[in-house]
């Protein structure tokens, strides 16, 4: 099993070679870069090529990119204007599509295979106009991504338009060939199903089209992005759910949120906690 980490852990700061050194030193072999311009300036070729060199120097593979979720420079600004493929207003939708094209075009100088994308914001309500907007945007993006060797993977979230059943119905009805899913276990654990059924019932509609996974834990109330086993997810059950996917060797990306504050552990300690959690996860996986 390849050890993979999302750079979301460092999203509040610029991603540097020193961070990559820490990631590699903690035993990870690949990364998913979370795209905010203050973290990684993906629209400047010089920055992209420098990142390619830094990843190669630390023997890290770029397995995926996470699309920006906000027009603001920092993902940590909660007041930021959402960058959404569901924009009903055409001008704003085209702006979002152009920004996502820039992320896809990173593959020209820094190859990667999957772009992880949210279906709108965290509170996106289901609306036929938004659905049509998403279809129009994705139709163009899938074609553009295909030429770059990138698969678009829409992630399940806690919004109505990010609900797994909604996402599967969207794909079945629009027949968007090539669209895939990123299954986020932490988000699934926040669904409205009874706790013991949340993961299976969230995974079931997406199962045949899941191409990647985000691993993180929470206590079933908010999106905490904790290391596995630090929340209330039943990980042996979660592993059985993941192993039911038709695609073998799914990329499993650990997506942690940085703990901050005077008494917070250092980033190095948080990386160590992630590594320890993955040791336990892999041991359980092999026994299941």
Indicate residue ranges for each PLM-predicted region.
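N-terminal pre-domain/capping segments
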Residues: 1-102, 108, 180, 208, ...
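Histidine-acidic metal/acid-base catalytic patches
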Residues: 1-3, 13-24, 164-288
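Hydrophobic faces of well-ordered beta-strands that scaffold small-molecule active sites
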Residues: 3-7, 31-33, 62-67, 115-117, ...
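Active-site-proximal loop/turn and secondary-structure-junction residues that shape catalytic pockets
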Residues: 9-11, 35-37, 68-71, 121-123, ...
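Active-site acidic/histidine proton-transfer and metal-coordination neighborhood
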Residues: 17, 74-181
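A structural motif
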Residues: 28, 107, 112, 210, ...
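Flexible, glycine- and charge-enriched loops at secondary-structure boundaries
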Residues: 41-44, 48, 86-93, 124-131, ...
